[in-house]
C-alpha cells in the first residue's frame, strides 16, 4: 500500500467517540440540584452525580460526597452539542493532549441558546471534554485479548486539530 493510500484509508479516518460535559459544584444541596437542572436542559440528557474521591477538610468535603454532575454524549447528540459549544469557546493547541483529546471550558451557562439568566440560580460554568479516536481503538480497552495500538494509528493533537477544523469549522489558534 502506498503512502497516499494509507493516509486516506477508512480505518485511519478519525471520529468523535464521545463528549463529556461536567459541572463541578464542590458541594451538595441546592447548588448541585441547580447544576443538574442546568446540565440536563443544555444537553437534553439525564445527568449523573459525581462524588469526591478523598476527604479535603479545608473545603469541608468528605470522601463520597456528591460534588458535581456530568453527562456523556455520543453519536448525533455529541455532534449537535459540540457544534453549539465550540461557538462559545476559543480553541487553542494547548487544549489538546498527546492523544488527541480536547478539553475546554464555558464560563457562563447562559451563553447557550436554550439558557436565560435566573437570579435565583446564578451563573455556573462547565467543562467539555471530547474524545476523538480512530476505528479499532476498542482493542486497547476491551477485557479479553487486549492489544496496544500501533504508534502510526494513534491519534495526535495535530490529527485532532485537523478533524475539528474540517468537520466543525473551528479555527484552532496557537
Swiss-Prot record:
**Name of the encoding gene:** rpl5
Q: Does the keyword RNA-binding apply?
A: yes
Q: Name one GO cellular component term.
A: ribosome
Question: InterPro entries attached here?
Answer: Ribosomal_uL5 (IPR002132), Ribosomal_uL5_arc (IPR022804), Ribosomal_uL5_C (IPR031309), Ribosomal_uL5_dom_sf (IPR022803), Ribosomal_uL5_N (IPR031310)
What are the entry keywords? Ribonucleoprotein, Ribosomal protein, RNA-binding, rRNA-binding, tRNA-binding
Organism for this UniProt entry: Halorubrum lacusprofundi (strain ATCC 49239 / DSM 5036 / JCM 8891 / ACAM 34)
Similarity remark = Belongs to the universal ribosomal protein uL5 family.
Report disulfide bridges, numbered on this chain. Answer: none
Whether Ribosomal protein counts among this entry's keywords is: yes
Q: Where in this chain does the entry annotate a coiled-coil region? A: none
Q: Name one Pfam family in it.
A: Ribosomal_L5
A GO biological process this protein is involved in?
A: translation
Function (record text): This is one of the proteins that bind and probably mediate the attachment of the 5S RNA into the large ribosomal subunit, where it forms part of the central protuberance. In the 70S ribosome it contacts protein S13 of the 30S subunit (bridge B1b), connecting the 2 subunits; this bridge is implicated in subunit movement. May contact the P site tRNA; the 5S rRNA and some of its associated proteins might help stabilize positioning of ribosome-bound tRNAs.
Could you cite one Gene Ontology molecular function of this protein?
Answer: structural constituent of ribosome
Q: How does it assemble?
A: Part of the 50S ribosomal subunit; contacts the 5S rRNA and probably tRNA. Forms a bridge to the 30S subunit in the 70S ribosome.
* Name this protein carries in UniProt: Large ribosomal subunit protein uL5
